[in-house]
């Protein structure tokens, strides 16, 4: 690829992260609240659970008479952060901490990055001007700040009423259907002038169940909408790297418990995670730091969908609209998982041993 955008994935020292985090972590969610005001409602979805995210999307969707959802993704956002973009972002932090020389010094280190790496034949040294160093304490905050403010400027440029659902470089823009053609025509060229490559990530959503945000879609339940993953993504939940069988059982119990909290009353998912719980063990893995910090554990906090009873007809229809699996096929899949018995030919797990010397 000729002259590709550089991607810097080396982390800085823990001391640097700690020193910068003392400033950015205390203002992060206050900045998110401030960004909400640019679009007239909750905009940055960081810190919300799936029920809350869905509630905010429904509220934004219902604020239009004939809405459409435009899925947008800034390709290689970190790599395309120019030094001008970083300086603008850093000035927002300096404004909140006037006179803090340490903060200014720390932020200055991000404008021109020097790094090195060892390889069998020697050592590589490099320098970048601009470019986000993936892993910096302000990566998520900075990306949200840049994206939301640019989207606000873009909507003002197009003179359109809009709501934004954002999580860094991943976002969905809601507008009236009659403004769709104008917005899609102007989007890519406008962002190119800003130094970013904005792409349409998937199909335009003409109904709420077709909105795709962070690989999730809204599904209606008797207690309101919740965000649900595509069934294909459950493959990631079905692979454990635990080195012994006891660890596998504990892992299954922990993932099953979190899964039921997230999707216990959702078609198919409830049956799958219930099978995990039946064959897993409670164990102490749920209290282990390595588990508490996983995506499943974080997403399930504050969720209690396993207490909402059996799958409702309205949920089956909404799930069908979102993912194309008919209610009949939903029941067939659920029955299959409900019949699984550990130790039989239909056991829910298989052990695979890696060749000697191979690690993951």
Where are these regions (language model features)?
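Active-site-proximal segment of RNA-dependent polymerases
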Residues: 8, 17-78, 139, 152
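Short, hydrophobic/amphipathic alpha-helical patches that form generic packing surfaces
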Residues: 14-29, 145-153, 253-264
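A generic structural motif
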Residues: 41-49, 99-111, 197-207
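Active-site and adjacent loop segments of nucleotide-processing enzymes
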Residues: 126, 130-133, 178-199, 204-360
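Conserved acidic
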Residues: 7-8, 12, 22-25, 82, ...
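Structural motif
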Residues: 3, 9-17, 242-253
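Short helix/loop capping segments that flank catalytic or ligand/cofactor-binding pockets
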Residues: 6, 32, 79-82, 86-88, ...
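Conserved polymerase palm-domain catalytic core
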Residues: 65-167, 172-181, 210
């Amino acid at each position: 690829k000729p002259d590709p955008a550089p991607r810097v994935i080396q982390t800085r020292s823990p001391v640097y992260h700690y020193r910068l985090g003392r400033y950015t972590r205390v203002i992060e969610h206050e900045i998110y609240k401030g960004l909400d005001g640019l679009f007239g409602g909750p905009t940055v979805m960081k810190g919300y659970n799936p029920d809350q995210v869905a509630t905010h999307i429904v509220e934004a969707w219902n604020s239009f008479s004939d809405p459409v959802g435009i899925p947008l993704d800034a390709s290689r956002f970190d790599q395309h952060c120019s030094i001008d973009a970083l300086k603008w972002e850093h000035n927002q932090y300096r404004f909140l901490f006037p006179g803090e020389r340490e903060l200014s010094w720390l932020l200055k280190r991000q404008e021109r990055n020097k790094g090195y790496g060892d390889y069998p034949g020697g050592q590589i040294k490099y320098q970048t001007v601009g470019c986000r160093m993936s892993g910096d304490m302000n990566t998520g905050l900075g990306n949200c700040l840049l994206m939301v403010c640019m989207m606000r400027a873009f909507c003002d440029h197009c003179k359109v009423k809009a709501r934004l659902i954002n999580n860094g470089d991943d976002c969905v823009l809601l507008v009236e259907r009659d403004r769709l053609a104008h917005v899609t025509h102007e989007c890519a060229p406008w962002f190119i002038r800003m130094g970013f490559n904005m792409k349409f990530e998937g199909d335009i959503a003409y109904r709420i169940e077709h909105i795709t945000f962070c690989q999730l879609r809204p599904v209606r339940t008797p207690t309101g909408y919740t965000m649900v993953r595509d069934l294909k993504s459950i493959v990631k939940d079905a692979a454990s790297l635990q080195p012994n069988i006891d660890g596998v059982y504990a892992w299954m119990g922990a993932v099953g418990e979190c899964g039921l909290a997230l999707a216990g009353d959702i078609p198919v998912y409830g049956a799958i995670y219930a099978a995990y719980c039946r064959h897993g063990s409670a164990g102490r893995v749920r209290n282990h730091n390595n588990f508490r910090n996983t995506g499943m554990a974080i997403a399930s906090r504050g969720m209690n969908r396993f207490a909402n009873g059996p799958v409702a007809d309205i949920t089956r229809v909404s799930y069908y609209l979102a993912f194309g699996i008919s209610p009949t096929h939903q029941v067939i899949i659920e029955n299959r998982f409900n019949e699984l018995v550990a130790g039989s030919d239909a056991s829910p797990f298989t052990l695979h041993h890696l060749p000697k010397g191979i690690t993951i």
